[in-house]
Amino acid sequence: MADSGDAGSSGPWWKSLTNSRKKSKEAAVGVPPPAQPAPGEPTPPAPPSPDWTSSSRENQHPNLLGGAGEPPKPDKLYGDKSGSSRRNLKISRSGRFKEKRKVRATLLPEAGRSPEEAGFPGDPHEDKQ
């Protein structure tokens, strides 16, 4: 059953599914490597390559640069609403985004005393009394 296909095929059935066409296409279209000039001859300047695989850093996308020492920054194009992260957004049944807000209980400083009575250091109301 393994060889139930064409008897004259040049390999396993899954070889046709791999990207071998892409490799042969790149080899045919690729620019031939420049010939090495003799040591006594001056080297001609290389013309700028329009290929996206050029080694100049200014032509590459900033997220594709490797070894820059800084992590790639995500683009802000995907609808970040008012600085909220995706973690804080909820999608309603209608498909709209709503911000999840945590309800916090107010903290009572010093076991029930009001902030004026608490006497915090650096309190601006402390000087007026």
UniProtKB/Swiss-Prot annotation:
<feature type="compositionally biased region" description="Pro residues">
    <location>
        <begin position="31"/>
        <end position="50"/>
    </location>
</feature>
<comment type="function">
    <text>May have a role in proliferation and/or differentiation.</text>
</comment>
<keyword id="KW-0217">Developmental protein</keyword>
<feature type="region of interest" description="Disordered">
    <location>
        <begin position="1"/>
        <end position="129"/>
    </location>
</feature>
<protein>
    <recommendedName>
        <fullName>Proline-rich protein 15</fullName>
    </recommendedName>
</protein>
<dbReference type="InterPro" id="IPR028237">
    <property type="entry name" value="PRR15"/>
</dbReference>
<comment type="similarity">
    <text>Belongs to the PRR15 family.</text>
</comment>
<dbReference type="Pfam" id="PF15321">
    <property type="entry name" value="ATAD4"/>
</dbReference>
<feature type="compositionally biased region" description="Basic residues">
    <location>
        <begin position="87"/>
        <end position="104"/>
    </location>
</feature>
